[in-house]
């Protein structure tokens, strides 16, 4: 996997966003939406009027690093 962005020390920003939402018990839209890339679920926001992009993530995103997700959640819960 190639990591495109670094957010708060986490190379993979999709993993960081999923972990952050789960660690903070945030309500997440489209969590089961089958997306193939980062922009797929951004385009699907049109179906949810008024929903911010940051509230929309997908566990199907190809950039999601499942192996580091648990570690990221634990670290974010300690913040």
Across the structure, where does each feature detected by a protein language model lie?
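N-terminal acidic leader/helix
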Residues: 2-33
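Compact alpha-helical subdomains of small soluble proteins
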Residues: 4, 40-79
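An amphipathic alpha-helix signature
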Residues: 15, 19, 35-46
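Short, exposed beta-strand "edge-strand" segments with a Pro/Gly-rich flavor and a Y/T-containing core
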Residues: 19, 33-35, 58-64
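Generic structural signal for hydrophobic core residues of well-folded globular domains
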Residues: 22-26, 35, 48, 73-76
């Amino acid at each position: 996997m190639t990591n495109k962005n670094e957010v708060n020390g986490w190379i993979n920003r999709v993993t960081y966003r999923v972990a952050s939402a789960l660690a903070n018990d945030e309500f997440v839209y489209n969590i089961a939406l089958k997306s193939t890339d980062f922009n797929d679920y951004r385009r699907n926001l049109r179906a949810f009027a008024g929903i911010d992009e940051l509230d929309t993530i997908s566990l199907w995103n190809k950039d999601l690093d499942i192996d580091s997700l648990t570690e990221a959640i634990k670290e974010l819960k300690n913040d």
